[in-house]
From Swiss-Prot:
Organism: Homo sapiens
Post-translational modification comment from the UniProt entry: Forms intermolecular disulfide bonds either with other MAGP-1 molecules or with other components of the microfibrils. May form transglutaminase cross-links.
Compartments, record wording: Secreted, Extracellular space, Extracellular matrix
PANTHER family found in the cross-reference section: MICROFIBRILLAR-ASSOCIATED PROTEIN 2 (PTHR16485:SF3)
Protein's UniProt name: Microfibrillar-associated protein 2
One Pfam family hit: MAGP
Stored InterPro entries: MAGP, ShKT_dom
One MF annotation (Gene Ontology) recorded for this entry: fibronectin binding
Predominant subcellular localization, coarse grouping: secreted
Amino acid sequence: MRAAYLFLLFLPAGLLAQGQYDLDPLPPFPDHVQYTHYSDQIDNPDYYDYQEVTPRPSEEQFQFQSQQQVQQEVIPAPTPEPGNAELEPTEPGPLDCREEQYPCTRLYSIHRPCKQCLNEVCFYSLRRVYVINKEICVRTVCAHEELLRADLCRDKFSKCGVMASSGLCQSVAASCARSCGSC
């Protein structure tokens, strides 16, 4: 029984060695028929092959980072009328808001068709490429929300507030920056 299994296992290799199989190359796929819906993605400069990406020198990286700094647009608060001075709120309200722009760049990968030829036989395979989606997003930041967030942070990480008020901020600056944004 084992001999029969071994015979059936090695039968294709033996027939291939004797030339029983026809190994004529298949005709190549026509370029204009296959993967036409990818043509706009292949020529798009926002698509990068992971093998082509090289690290930038530090000076060039610094210039790139300085170009991506957050832009803020401040919306002025309405001015109170002189006759209604007693109705002025002491805490910021919902009108003390501003729109803040920030870069929300995302990196994700897709599979791009890649033509490969070997001994006049061409075929397409899918190659992973990375796409950089560069966008500027806008969020509304209100003063009362920032105060609530600061209060929660101060309560949760009390040592940051204590160190900041006592002038010893530098000793815990790293942990406070991770938790609250800054000391």
